[in-house]
Amino acid sequence: MWIIYAIGSAFFAGITSILAKCGISKTDSDVATAIRTVVVLVFSWILVLLTGTISGITDIGGKTLLFLVLSGIATGASWLCYFKALQNGNVNKVVPIDKSSTILTILLALIFFHEGLSLAKIGCVCMIGLGTMLMINRKEDVKSNTSDKSWLIYAILSAVFASLTSILGKIGISGIDSNLGTAIRTSVVLVMAWLMVFVKNKQSEIKSIDIKELLFIILSGFATGASWICFYRALQDGPASVVVPIDKL
């Protein structure tokens, strides 16, 4: 069953990238991230209420809560870097780099969870790495300045934080319902995202957001919420070294 959830996560994650790109053509990436996080948070807590798992919040241990918070911080950092990269670079180049976090996740899962390493996994890691390089070099970016490589730095940081998110999240949801865990960590992401907006004094830009872009940002939030719920349900039941590669398809 976890394989189905992992496939669902990959599907919604793919939609998220396209919708998000459409929503940040003119809108600042930090502001867009903060707004879509609100949508994800509402989506997550509604699901918790509908499934009746909110009662489990009193049973959460200190270790579980710590790793959920750390996972949320890593997610927030990954998001901020990812959407900054999308804003400055070509989606066809940014997304493959972000997806390459699979390689690091497999290695970290091997170290921390002792999930084992087979020839098949080694082959997959090599193919993912090769495929990433080919996709990055496949198309020239005709929209952005080719001399500006800041998107590359942000994309790499996004991949690193995304990998940490998977590992920390795997530990954090080991003892609680995955939907509740997703809602809690999304709350952390929300705080982090809005702090970034206010620290950079960008809150005034919210009023000037184009309605069409706002719609795409909201839709990307729903897609993200669906992807997260599927991902952490799959991660709770399946091995991280297999779930993450499926999610990154």
Label each PLM-derived region with a short phrase.
Residues 9, 98-102, 158, 162, ...:
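Structural signature of transmembrane alpha-helices in multi-pass secondary transporters
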Residues 30-31, 92, 118-120, 179-180, ...:
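Residues that define the loop-to-transmembrane-helix transition and helix capping
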Residues 1-12, 20-68, 73, 79-89, ...:
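Membrane-interface interhelical linkers
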Residues 23, 32, 85, 111-113, ...:
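Hydrophobic/aromatic residues within transmembrane alpha-helices
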Residues 1-8, 103-160:
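Juxtamembrane helix-loop boundary signature in multi-pass membrane transporters
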Residues 38-43, 97-111, 187-192, 227, ...:
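Alpha-helical transmembrane segments of compact multi-pass small-molecule transporters, enriched
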Residues 8, 35-36, 70, 97-100, ...:
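Hydrophobic core positions of alpha-helical segments in small-molecule transporters
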